[in-house]
């Protein structure tokens, strides 16, 4: 069977799932593409912080995927961060937990499904370093298969699954350069290792993903930026141990603005996807709100 036909067959046998963004198995993954932007590499002082993300994602086509494809995702993602006073290897220690809440509408090839549920729980630990205008973060994130997941059936082959039904380990590096002249150059890079979906015997291939931001501070409180994300699958998916030799990729870019006050900030962006291969293609709007307790 040719790779494209095999991939399409797998999509209809297993159902198509998604949460915040999409990649790998059935065009879906747990990485929040585009969520981070300005000062992504700078951790705050010790304390407790609430970060709340809202994302609307719409895709009207699936490259090398099923016909008549439409995907609409609305996600509210609270992230609780605890920065401790402890230091290891010269870096400040912190922890975080993320629990997505997702509403997903999906249609493909004349079939449709809708789901609203909790997504997969994410837990992470991190170290942050600061040296003059340079800021770094090193982190390890675990994505647990806790979200709602329904195994597709012959009568319901297209399923709007919120959870992925597999676990992920994700090392992360982030960096920001913020000199006094107002420039803000930031990036967050990650690599994801996925285990097998026990219900489908499908293993999503390893992939590289990253957010980027090139911004400028217009005033003490207001910044503008060009932001986006990249995704590149570097290992093929597997079904029952056999490679499916199609790998996803995407590049997204768009404008962003940020307003920051004493103990809170809000960032908004609109990103359009291009250079898409073997995955949904669309656009996304994101809001990120940070509150320091």
Stretches with model-predicted labels:
Residues 27, 34, 55-57, 201-293:
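Outer membrane beta-barrel transmembrane domains
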Residues 22-82:
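N-terminal, post-signal peptide beta-strand-biased segments of exported outer-membrane/organellar beta-barrel
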Residues 50-56, 95-101, 138-144, 187-191, ...:
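Transmembrane beta-barrel strands of outer-membrane/channel proteins
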Residues 40, 52, 78-82, 123-129, ...:
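Residues on the lipid-exposed face of transmembrane beta-strands in outer-membrane beta-barrel proteins
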Residues 1-31:
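Cleavable N-terminal export/targeting peptides
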Residues 24-26, 39-47, 84-94, 108, ...:
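Short loop/turn motifs that connect adjacent beta-strands in outer-membrane beta-barrel proteins
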Residues 101-197, 202-203, 260:
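Outer-membrane pore/translocation modules
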């Amino acid at each position: 069977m040719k790779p494209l036909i095999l991939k399409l067959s797998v999509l209809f046998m297993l159902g198509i799932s998604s949460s915040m963004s999409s990649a790998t198995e059935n065009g879906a993954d747990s990485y929040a593409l585009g969520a981070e932007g300005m000062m992504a590499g700078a951790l705050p002082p010790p304390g407790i912080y609430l970060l709340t993300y809202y994302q609307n994602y719409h895709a009207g086509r699936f490259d090398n995927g099923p016909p008549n494809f439409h995907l609409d995702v609305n996600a509210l993602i609270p992230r609780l961060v605890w920065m401790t006073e402890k230091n290891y290897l010269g870096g400040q220690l912190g922890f975080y937990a993320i629990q997505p809440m997702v509403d997903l509408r999906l249609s493909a090839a004349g079939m449709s499904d809708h789901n609203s549920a909790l997504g997969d729980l994410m837990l992470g630990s991190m170290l942050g370093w600061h040296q003059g205008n340079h800021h770094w973060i090193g982190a390890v994130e675990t994505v647990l298969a806790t979200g709602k997941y329904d195994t597709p059936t012959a009568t319901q082959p297209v399923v709007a699954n919120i959870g992925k039904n597999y676990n992920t380990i994700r090392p992360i590096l982030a960096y920001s350069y913020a000199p006094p002249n107002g420039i803000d150059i930031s990036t967050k890079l990650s690599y994801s290792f996925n285990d097998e979906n026990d219900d489908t015997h499908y293993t999503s291939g390893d992939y590289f993903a990253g957010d980027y931001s090139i911004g400028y501070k217009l005033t003490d409180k207001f910044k503008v930026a060009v932001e986006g994300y990249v995704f590149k699958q570097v290992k093929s998916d597997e079904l029952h141990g056999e490679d499916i030799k199609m790998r996803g990729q995407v590049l997204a870019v768009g404008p962003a603005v940020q307003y920051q006050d004493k103990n809170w900030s809000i960032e908004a962006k609109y990103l359009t996807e291009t250079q898409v291969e073997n995955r949904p293609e669309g656009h996304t709007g994101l809001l990120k709100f940070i509150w320091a307790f």
